Amino acid sequence: MVKNLIFWLVITVVLMSIFQNFNTNDVNNHKVDYSTFLSEVNQDQIREAYINGRMISVTKKDSSKYTTYIPINDPKLLDNLLVKRVKIIGAIPEEPSLFISILISWFPMLLLIGVWIFFMRQMQMGGGKGAMSFGKSKARMLSEDQIQTTFADVAGCDEAKEEVSELVEYLKEPSRFQKLGGKIPKGILMVGPPGTGKTLLAKAIAGEAKVPFFTISGSDFVEMFVGVGASRVRDMFEHSRKSAPCIIFIDEIDAVGRQRGAGLGGGHDEREQTLNQMLVEMDGFDGNEGIILIAATNRPDVLDPALLRPGRFDRQVIVALPDIRGREQILKVHMRKVPLSKDVDPMIIARGTPGFSGADLANLVNEAALFAARLDKRVVSMLEFERAKDKMMMGSERRSMVMSDFQKESTAYHEAGHVIIGRLVPDHDPAHKVTIIPRGRALGVTFFLPESDTLSISRQKLESQISTLYGGRLAEEIIYGAKNVSTGAYNDIKIATSLAKNMVTQWGFSEKLGPLLYAEEEGEIFLGRSVAKAKHMSDETARIIDEEVKLLIEINYSRARNILNENIDILHAMKEALIKYETIDAFQIDDLMKRREVRQPKGWIETDTNK
């Protein structure tokens, strides 16, 4: 920063001195045209004329002054002035100094060189570390005092913590392992969906072991200049050796560790040179150096096999989505700084958030706190957590959207059809909440909440899901006729078709085709294994697959139609409840399915609008 200020200060001083050299002493005098000057000479009003090139500084007999400019060379001017007895003073031409002459001739070139150096420094190093330092590592080093994260801050992944806990013991006491001939894994690859806490777990390892922590993203290695990535890899490992024992953490390593020869661009590019250098460095340092490389990715399938072999990343730690107990622990960690009402139960929230990652749960707590802050509450209650969960699962409410009475009615029938089918088909998740308030891009939403974490899905459950997906379209068809069915079921049809196709081609749920895999490979061009899309079936087999998919859809479509026809009274009653209350939960759904009077939702107040 100081060097940049000095650089621009020098340029400013030089420019000011150059401009000052060309200034005249009489720039502030009043200017008059040349014809007026000649007229006043003829009228004998001029006392003195100071001639400096083509500029004349004039002093009149009344002591007033002005300047004028000779537009063309006038040979009679001096004679006229002498005739009128005007005092003539000629300016002595000033020769510029040698320094000014050299500066004027070289200044443009020096300015261009200075600007080039400045911009190269800013673009490449972002802070004045030198214009030729492109190959320096961008890894940021955090000392043991800067890392406050510990295993207590990481929840919901007990198995992963147990896997990496021996790293902490090794970094604290390496001789304990070395004297028995044991070697700690040189590299650990953390694999898991986004938001599961891979980066947080790596920081906790460094925080527990109290060792330096180098962090860098996979995309920071590759630049526009050839060879920069490999140079940065060398520089990073060189610095880490000086700080050993230490941890190097590479986030999103698939940006640089993608399989070589991938895509259409050939096999020799800057990214592959960087990967080759990383492979050499990982295999080059000995285990007793105390350098542990940890990387994180959610795309392990695209990584180069050489990167995953023993001796490099020889251990994979799966950081999966948390189960119900893990979600409860994560919620408790994030609720530490939030004032909570007595009715808040983390276990109930955890039970209602299957499939949520650690990042999702952190966002849930934050959204609940924001809801409470908007209402000027002092504590966050269970109601705010419920509203935050609905927002994350079903989208934000769009109450400003104007819907006609017919649109509300058709949406209510559509959502009621989903709910009724979902409640009456076997092995289906129970309906948790249904609303006709527009949320996100949907006019209405039906949300089914699993009773437990889903590990595998049975054929019966898949067929029940297909029937439920068509429940909305069938409800419209039964009430309004086939010609008046809307396009609102587009996404339902898309999901149902995909499920049926997977059941036939991937999961072996077709009696005619048997338990064989018929799925075509997708995304191969990005992995570099094939440019053309491979086809693993004959035309006749493809025709049979289409027939089986259609048959599966027709069976479940017909089942859903029969269920709605047999429960048409519940369909009408649920439509009325949705129009009145706009949102109903599992308790109201139970009342409707048992043909009882529907209780009012909690906190609902009847107004003239919803009458």
Curated annotation (Swiss-Prot):
Extracellular side: 23-98
Gene of this entry: ftsH
GO biological process, one term: proteolysis
Record-annotated membrane-spanning stretches: 2-22, 99-119
SMART domains linked: AAA
Family of the protein in this entry: In the central section; belongs to the AAA ATPase family. In the C-terminal section; belongs to the peptidase M41 family.
Cofactor binding mode and count: Binds 1 zinc ion per subunit.
Intervals, Cytoplasmic compartment: 1, 120-611
Record keywords, A-Z: ATP-binding, Cell membrane, Hydrolase, Membrane, Metal-binding, Metalloprotease, Nucleotide-binding, Protease, Transmembrane, Transmembrane helix, Zinc
SUPFAM superfamilies linked to this entry: FtsH protease domain-like (SSF140990), P-loop containing nucleoside triphosphate hydrolases (SSF52540)
Protein name listed in UniProt: ATP-dependent zinc metalloprotease FtsH
Assembly, per entry: Homohexamer.
Cofactor(s) annotated in UniProt: Zn(2+)
GO terms, molecular function: ATP binding; ATP hydrolysis activity; ATP-dependent peptidase activity; metalloendopeptidase activity; zinc ion binding
